[in-house]
Design a protein with these regions (language model features):
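Substrate-binding clefts and substrate-entry loops adjacent to catalytic sites
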Residues: 4-16, 44
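Signal peptide-directed extracytoplasmic domains
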Residues: 1-4, 27
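Penicillin-recognizing serine hydrolase domain
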Residues: 20-173
């Protein structure tokens, strides 16, 4: 639920499970940001939802994504289009979780590569955001875009922008 599709309540539960409290988890987040030299980032919550002193940049988030992709479990989740959970009493067939990025793509966005995974985001303050991973002409690229116009109910300009950037990389010799 934290990445597929996206759930603030899942982030909060994960934070409490890992660290005992959201505050302790946020301290770990800021410690990791310092280790990764994310100099323009300060976390206030585990969800990414708007708070006055909660901020980052596309460059810093790209550093974080690059580090996270080194973890095989994270990479698998980040690049998964759908996942069905184990059966429970409430969901005897399991619960279907769907990538908010990959579910919007059909694999024909560009000819010599593919968008492998990503995480969309939106708040009124931040606009449409996207952190994505693609392979273009055999090379992997990370792209983070922030502040695209629109909302969940509009055209996903953040995804359109990423496709255009990856297409330009494909044309580059």
């Amino acid at each position: 639920g934290t990445l597929l599709p996206s759930g603030a309540e899942c982030c909060e539960a994960l934070a409490r499970e890992v660290s005992g409290s959201e505050e302790a988890f946020v301290a770990l987040m800021n410690q990791k940001a310092a280790e990764l030299e994310m100099q323009n980032t300060h976390f206030c919550n585990p969800t990414g939802l708007t708070e006055l002193e909660h901020y980052s940049t596309a460059a810093d988030l790209a550093k974080l994504l690059q580090a996270a992709l080194q973890n095989p479990t994270f990479r698998t989740i980040f690049t998964t289009e759908t996942y069905t959970s184990s059966a429970t009493a409430q969901h005897p067939e399991g619960l279907l979780l769907v990538s908010t990025l990959l579910s919007r793509l059909d694999g024909t966005e560009f000819s010599d590569g593919a968008i492998l995974g990503g995480k969309t985001g939106y708040t009124k303050a931040a606009g449409l955001c996207l952190a994505s991973l693609a392979v273009v002409r055999g090379k992997e690229y990370i792209l983070v875009t922030l502040g695209a116009p629109g909302s969940h109910a509009t055209v996903q300009t953040n995804i359109q922008d990423a496709i255009q950037v990856y297409r330009r990389l494909q044309k580059k010799k």
